[in-house]
Amino acid sequence: GDIYVSTDFMLLTQKKHGIDVSMRAALKTASGNDYATARYYDNAGYFFDTAAAHTFTIIPKRSEFILSASGGFLCWQTDNGRQNDAVMYGLRASYRYKGVSFSSEYGGYVGWEKEGDAPMTLKSTLSGKVGNIVLSIGHQIGFRDWPFQQLRIGFAVNL
């Protein structure tokens, strides 16, 4: 399997500057050494991105709307031994009311090789909190260079 290692830096906070801005640096390892298995982003790579978000409080401590955008740089090894570089982008809107949230996200990246390296996705997720358990269901649709759909059902336990 692959391993992601990342670190996030909070650059600005909404409380002090009117907007949350963070930066992330990440490294992705790969579990193979065969170039033939390097399809799209299945091999080792790294990325840097920056995200900005603003939270609009609708009902204090109960309801909020969050808008965010991100952009970055992605680099990975391809199946021909070269590396591909791409510009990453994303937009997200989410709404939270008490313990329930709904979010939609549009994003992807555009590489320079122009061969299977410009996927876009649209994801929507509904989640709810019951005690210390978070239940979620989501749907993801792929466009351009990622012609797949996913239905995601999950749970998390907050310790």
Feature map (PLM): residue ranges:
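Outer membrane beta-barrel transmembrane domains
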Residues: 80-81, 87-159
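Outer-membrane pore/translocation modules
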Residues: 1-85
